[in-house]
Structures are given as C-alpha cells and as structure tokens.
C-alpha cells in the first residue's frame, strides 16, 4: 500500500510493529529518490516512513528476487496516474504466482495491465477502479490448507479433509500437493476437496522460489520424514514477520529435530518418526511459525508449551478452534 500512499500528494505515514519495522524497503526508496519524492524514515531506513508527494508516470524497474509485494504495490498504483507507465522486473523473478493473482484481481475491478511477458508490463494511465461483478467467489486458501494437509499426513489417525480448494488456482501454494506427494503422502482429491491420510514420508529437495510460505510447515514434515530434505531458494524468509528459517530450525531442534541452517535454506535430517517434544517453544510473533509448531505438536511424543500462540490471529483467527475440531488438544496456561 506504500505506492498508493504516494499518490495522495500529502504527508502519508506508514508504521509497523515487530519484524515488520525492519523489513527492507529499498526498492521503493530508490524510486522515491529517482523522482525527487520527499520521504522520511526511521533509523537505518526502517519504519515509520512518511512520504509526501505524488508518483509520476514513467519507466519503473524493480528487482524480482526481494518480494513480489513491491511489484503488486506498483501494479495497484500506476493505473491511477495521469499518463502511461511501464514496469520492468529484473530477473530472477520469484513468487511469480502472487503477481498472477494481483493481475487477476485488478482485471476483475476494471484495471487493464498489458503484460508482454513475466518481466515486462505496460500500464495505461487515467484508469479508475470499478465495482464490476456484484458477487465475487473467493476461493479456498492453499496456504492455510497446507497446515492441515501436513497435519493429516503426520499426526492424524483418521485423516483430514480440506474443502473448497481449486485445483486450477493461480495460488503458488497449491504446490503443497506436488511436494507432499513427492514425499510419499497419501492424498485423495475429489470434487474440490483434498484428504490427507497418515503416511510415512521421505526426504527430498524442495525449491521454495514460488512457494516460500509453505516452508515452515514443510520443515515440520521433513523433520519426521525418513532421509534428508534440502530446502533451497528460501532466503527471503529471513525478512518476514521474523527470520522464519532461524525460527523453525531453533524451535524444532528444541523439540528434538535435526536441522541445519544455510544462508538460503535448511538442511533437515529426518527422524523417520515422532519428535520427542516435551519442551517450551516460541512462535516469534509469527502466525505461520505458530501454526507450524502446532502441527509439529501432533507428531511429538510429549506435549509442548507454545508461547505467542495468539499470533495466528493475523491470518487465521479460527485456527485453534479448527485445531480442536481435527483432533488436536490444547489448553491455555496462565503465566
């Protein structure tokens, strides 16, 4: 939403909490400097950020390997400028699926983006968002379904079924089906639902370029699998709500896993069975870490204590109710 704030031509301030404050914003700062757009930041370029002015139409360039959110932000804002603009993405491009979702959403609301290829876009100016269809179907979330599919595979006697999923979705995280199947999972697809049943897993190589949000829960699956799993091209996870690579390695190792950090990924030697558990672990104020550790608890011999469990509210407020519904057990401890 930063580019949208840079359309207002009045001071617009963005604030954040936790790790969000220190997430890199240099791609936007470079644009502001090039256009002479006044902005003020916190220490070392961190939030809060105040931008005062208005973006100008023209030629824009962004790196493709930092975050697709920078690209989506400009695609939302540039159509509202007075004249046409172009956007070039510098390779390598990661998380391309998220850009596809952005383009589809823009089209639904009357915005035209001319895409030459995955790296080049022409954005006509003087456009306006239109209400479009009175009713829009919101498809199921493969990112959230991934937690239950892993849970059904490693920690459920009766299996878990996720409904309302579109096999032809543009969501990159539908890769969970391919990855879990490659690891040996027993997945049954039927009429928009997927059922995951308990099955022994085997390690493999996982390229996280286009599905980084799957890494935390796939790390759990790999920790109890047989053999070695190598997660690669996942360096961007170090600048999410927390350093997710470090968080998952630290907390799962505390539960008895064997995980080594690498600059761009994780090397996981699976236990070929349950984790010992019985320890206190922390969610690092990160919703995906919290949900992944909850799934890990299903594959632990002893109960765990999870601090920061409330962080699931960022993306999945009903997670703990669903956790109980599929057979998980939890209780709140006052400390």
Where are these regions (language model features)?
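Short, structured segments at the rim of ligand-binding sites
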Residues: 1-335
């Amino acid at each position: 939403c930063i580019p949208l704030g840079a359309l207002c031509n009045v001071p617009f301030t963005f604030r954040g909490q936790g790790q969000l404050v220190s997430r890199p914003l240099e791609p936007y700062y470079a644009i502001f400097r090039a256009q002479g757009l006044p902005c003020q930041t916190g220490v070392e370029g961190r939030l809060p950020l105040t931008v005062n002015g208005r973006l100008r139409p023209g030629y824009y360039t962004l790196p493709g390997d930092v975050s697709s959110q920078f690209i989506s932000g400009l695609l939302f804002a540039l159509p509202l400028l007075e004249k046409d603009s172009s956007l070039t993405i510098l390779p390598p491009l990661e998380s391309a699926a998220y850009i596809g979702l952005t383009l589809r959403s823009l089209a639904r609301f009357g915005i035209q983006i001319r895409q030459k290829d995955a790296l080049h876009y022409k954005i006509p100016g003087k456009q306006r968002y239109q209400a479009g269809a009175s009713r829009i179907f919101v498809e199921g979330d493969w990112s959230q379904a991934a937690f239950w599919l892993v849970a059904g595979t490693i920690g459920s006697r009766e299996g878990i079924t996720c409904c309302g999923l579109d096999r032809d979705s543009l969501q990159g995280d539908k890769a969970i089906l391919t990855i879990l199947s490659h690891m040996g999972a027993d997945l049954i697809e039927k009429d928009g639902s997927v059922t995951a049943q308990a099955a022994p897993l085997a390690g493999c190589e996982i390229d996280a370029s286009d599905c980084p949000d799957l890494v935390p829960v796939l790390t759990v699956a790999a920790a109890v699998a047989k053999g070695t799993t190598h997660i690669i091209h996942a360096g961007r996870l170090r600048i999410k709500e927390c350093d997710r690579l470090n968080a998952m390695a630290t907390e799962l190792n505390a539960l008895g896993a064997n995980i080594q950090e690498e600059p761009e990924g994780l090397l996981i030697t699976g236990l070929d069975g349950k984790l010992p558990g019985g320890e206190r672990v922390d969610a690092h104020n990160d919703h995906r870490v919290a949900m992944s550790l909850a799934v890990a608890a299903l594959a632990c011999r002893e109960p765990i204590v999870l601090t920061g469990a409330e962080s699931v509210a960022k993306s999945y407020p009903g997670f703990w109710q669903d956790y109980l519904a599929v057979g998980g057990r939890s209780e709140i401890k006052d400390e």
